[in-house]
Amino acid sequence: MIGRLRGIIIEKQPPLVLIEVGGVGYEVHMPMTCFYELPEAGQEAIVFTHFVVREDAQLLYGFNNKQERTLFKELIKTNGVGPKLALAILSGMSAQQFVNAVEREEVGALVKLPGIGKKTAERLIVEMKDRFKGLHGDLFTPAADLVLTSPASPATDDAEQEAVAALVALGYKPQEASRMVSKIARPDVSSETLIREALRAAL
């Protein structure tokens, strides 16, 4: 269906971005590790997408490159892992960090992600390790790791509320999300920075 979008960013409301292509606005759900890399509103962006059809919704998930999208597709094939949980996984750690955690069988790192218990972490390691072999080890290389840069957008008065809302959307409970943000909140910081630091602190 829709595999790639090239258009102007109209609005950024993590983890959602609205991209206008040919007069049509597409709402795209993105992992926060990809969201951080987006240009500012009003600028052009290219996003690789995966289209998910449910009984109650049709959703687009977006990524900065094909490798991240491939990993997302492999994740949602795992028993007990749907698109929302896969999005949370790739928001809590970069694609390369996840690949490294699986290859090193780091259950402790995976269970810190929202919605991941010990059994799910162990299942991910077993199933994803086999899939990585099937991809001939070419899914990612160390050089492909994401470099998270500080967003240039100015902080807003409701940055903390936006950060909490984004964490809830990623699977954290409201009280837990509020606590995570309050620990690292400070004046004049954008919501994207708060989200990134909250996720880092959680790991």
Swiss-Prot record:
It comes from the Bacteria. GO terms for molecular function: ATP binding; four-way junction DNA binding; four-way junction helicase activity. CDD domains: UBA_RuvA_C. It holds the Pfam family RuvA_C. Keywords: Cytoplasm, DNA damage, DNA recombination, DNA repair, DNA-binding. Residues 143-154 are annotated as: Flexible linker. InterPro entries: DNA_helicase_Holl-junc_RuvA_I, Hlx-hairpin-Hlx_DNA-bd_motif, NA-bd_OB-fold, RuvA, RuvA_2-like, RuvA_C, RuvA_C_sf. Residues 1-64 are annotated as: Domain I. GO terms for cellular component: cytoplasm; Holliday junction helicase complex; Holliday junction resolvase complex. Residues 155-203 are annotated as: Domain III. Disulfide bonds: none annotated. The RuvA-RuvB-RuvC complex processes Holliday junction (HJ) DNA during genetic recombination and DNA repair, while the RuvA-RuvB complex plays an important role in the rescue of blocked DNA replication forks via replication fork reversal (RFR). RuvA specifically binds to HJ cruciform DNA, conferring on it an open structure. The RuvB hexamer acts as an ATP-dependent pump, pulling dsDNA into and through the RuvAB complex. HJ branch migration allows RuvC to scan DNA until it finds its consensus sequence, where it cleaves and resolves the cruciform DNA. NCBIfam families: ruvA (TIGR00084). Homotetramer. Forms an RuvA(8)-RuvB(12)-Holliday junction (HJ) complex. HJ DNA is sandwiched between 2 RuvA tetramers; dsDNA enters through RuvA and exits via RuvB. An RuvB hexamer assembles on each DNA strand where it exits the tetramer. Each RuvB hexamer is contacted by two RuvA subunits (via domain III) on 2 adjacent RuvB subunits; this complex drives branch migration. In the full resolvosome a probable DNA-RuvA(4)-RuvB(12)-RuvC(2) complex forms which resolves the HJ. Belongs to the RuvA family. This is Holliday junction branch migration complex subunit RuvA. It comes from Shigella dysenteriae serotype 1 (strain Sd197).
